[in-house]
Amino acid sequence: MEIILKEDVVNLGYKNDIVTVKSGYGRNYLIPTGKAVIASPSAKKMLAEELKQRAHKLEKIKKDAEALAAKLEGVSLTIATKVSSTGTIFGSVGNIQIAEELAKLGHEIDRKIIVVKDAVKEVGAYKAIVKLHKEVSVEIPFEVVAE
């Protein structure tokens, strides 16, 4: 029996895969629980159309991410914080402060996609990575200075 999986099934396949299973497994478990549908010609046609539309959407999202990456390419940030006499920062500089500085420049970036590798606890120059898409990321240099 050929079926189309509606979600990932362990040891069988991933969502939208067309797989062959024993009739009892398909009729008594996969189809009643909503994990699969019978792979009729019309269902296969609908699946192909859905995958085509999804690919088009993903391509558009990637193009938008690449356009934003091009805008962020030349950006350099300066973050002013309170500093002790030894040059250490009170607290630390993280993705929240970088997102705020980018917002001041007109780039609304979610703080969750900004990655700072090491804890920034001293004055100096550092780099942050903005992961706009799984295939598109931008490295933004930033400098921490005394307020």
From Swiss-Prot:
Keywords: Ribonucleoprotein, Ribosomal protein, RNA-binding, rRNA-binding. It comes from the Bacteria. Disulfide bonds: none annotated. The keyword Ribosomal protein applies. The keyword NAD does not apply. Binds to the 23S rRNA. Belongs to the bacterial ribosomal protein bL9 family. This is Large ribosomal subunit protein bL9.
